[in-house]
């Protein structure tokens, strides 16, 4: 398998993430094109989720959490999950468990952030209640910012591109 051909076909970030996801100390990596393609789908999911969040920003959007009394149960849930993720990934990185760290970030983004939290906020984003809408946007942006920071060492190109668009 030629790295240059894989980069041209699937992108640098997908290849880097694949290599990291399957990296374990003392283990050879069994690289296949199907695995790289699978992580390219993950890159696309991240890109689409980011576009969705960014297209819902208002003019007064900012990257800071709202007051605690404004947070709804779903907001508190995702922030709790995010804090746990940050602690676990930090611990994994300190132990050089890169594959474990990226798998946790992958699972959080795919399952918690995209499949659950974004879906839970859709009604609020289209709501007439400006405070509920603004709170949802602020939490969406904050969590996106944090996951981009966690992903950046492994997917520097797409994370930088998205991060430049965050207020």
Each predicted region: which residue ranges?
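Helix-rich, typically C-terminal accessory recognition domains appended to large enzymatic cores
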Residues: 6-167
